[in-house]
C-alpha cells in the first residue's frame, strides 16, 4: 500500500482524518486544497498547474495520503491509488461542523454586515446541496459516480464516527488486507 485517497463532502472530516492517519502510518499527508487554491478559498489555481504540482508531490512522497476531492480536475490520478476511503456523515452534523469551522476561520466577519457574510452564505448553501444534488456540483451523486470505475478497493465509512474510530477502522482494514495478500 503506497497511496491512499480520502474524500467526501465538505465538513466530512477528510483532512482531519488524513492528518491523523499519517500520524499512525509512515505516510506523508497531502491535501487537495493545497493544489486547488492559489490563495486559500478565494483564487483557484489553473487546472494544469494543480495537476503538475500534485504529480510532482506524488512522485516525491512514495507513501502518501491525499485528502479532499479530485473529481473533475484530478480524474487522471485515479489509477495512482491503492485504496480510496469515502466518508459520509449526516447532513445536520456536517453543516454544524462547517458553521463552527467557518466561525473559527473568520469570526464575526461571517455574521450579518460582516465582510465575509455573502461568501459564507454562498458556501453554506453550496455545502447543503451535497446529499441531494446531481453531478453538476460536488455531491454524493458525483462522488458515487466517480468511484464507479476505480480499479482499487473502496472503503466506505458512513456515519458519525470520531477521528479515532475512523483511524481504527482503517488500520483494521489494512491489517486484514495485508494478511490476505500474504
Which residues does each predicted region cover?
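NTP-dependent small-molecule kinase module
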Residues: 125-182
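Walker A (P-loop) ATP-phosphate-binding motif of ABC ATPase nucleotide-binding domains
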Residues: 3
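Glycine-rich phosphate-binding loop used to anchor ATP phosphates in small-molecule kinases
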Residues: 47-92
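The conserved Walker
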Residues: 10
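Hydrophobic anchor at the beta1->P-loop junction of P-loop NTPases
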Residues: 6
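A glycine- and Lys/Arg-enriched "phosphate-lid" helix/loop adjacent to the NTP-binding pocket
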Residues: 88-138
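Conserved substrate/cofactor phosphate-moiety recognition/catalytic segment
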Residues: 19, 23-62
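Walker A/P-loop
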Residues: 14-15
